[in-house]
């Protein structure tokens, strides 16, 4: 599991990750938002190695984080990658959606993806804590968990495409 908290500025002219995967940190990044606890569940079972079924399993990611009054509300992304690390998809919370639940700046949020549209296979689940515009990464954990999905169908590729088939004259 790779966990990274940016504490030293990384100088790149455009804010894009450099060859080490780092993005520039803002000044005093220790006082900014941070992940406190993240839990991944598949079909109501929490863990780091989870098993489910394509098209019917429900993925939930519960995130407890620390916000900062000096910084605009952060954003969180849940990233699904292949077992080799290739990003397949991501879900970002809306800008301004995270606010502190109490005086200490703690916030609790949940990401839910019902009826997982992923085909059979093994996938990584990662969580990224970003600045309010989604440009800078404060902290990430990837992989946080792995999910293994089974499917009895003949589908090809990582996604099971929805849609309807109909015959017509």
Map each language-model feature to its residues.
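Localized sequence-composition bias
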Residues: 1-169
């Amino acid at each position: 599991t790779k966990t990274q908290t940016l504490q030293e500025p990384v100088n790149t002219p455009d804010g894009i990750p450099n060859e080490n995967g780092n993005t520039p940190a803002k000044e005093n990044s220790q006082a900014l938002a941070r992940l406190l606890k993240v839990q991944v569940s598949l079909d109501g079972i929490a863990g780091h190695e989870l098993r489910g079924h394509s098209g019917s399993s429900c993925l939930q990611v519960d995130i407890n984080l620390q916000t900062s009054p000096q910084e605009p509300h952060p954003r969180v992304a849940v990233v699904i990658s292949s077992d080799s690390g290739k990003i397949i998809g991501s879900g970002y919370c809306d800008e301004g959606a995270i606010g502190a639940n109490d005086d200490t700046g703690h916030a609790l949020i949940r990401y839910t993806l019902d009826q997982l549209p992923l085909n059979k296979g093994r996938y990584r689940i990662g969580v990224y804590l970003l600045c309010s515009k989604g440009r800078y990464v404060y902290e990430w954990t990837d992989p946080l968990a792995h999910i293994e999905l089974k499917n009895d169908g003949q589908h090809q590729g990582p996604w099971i495409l929805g849609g309807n088939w109909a015959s017509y004259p």
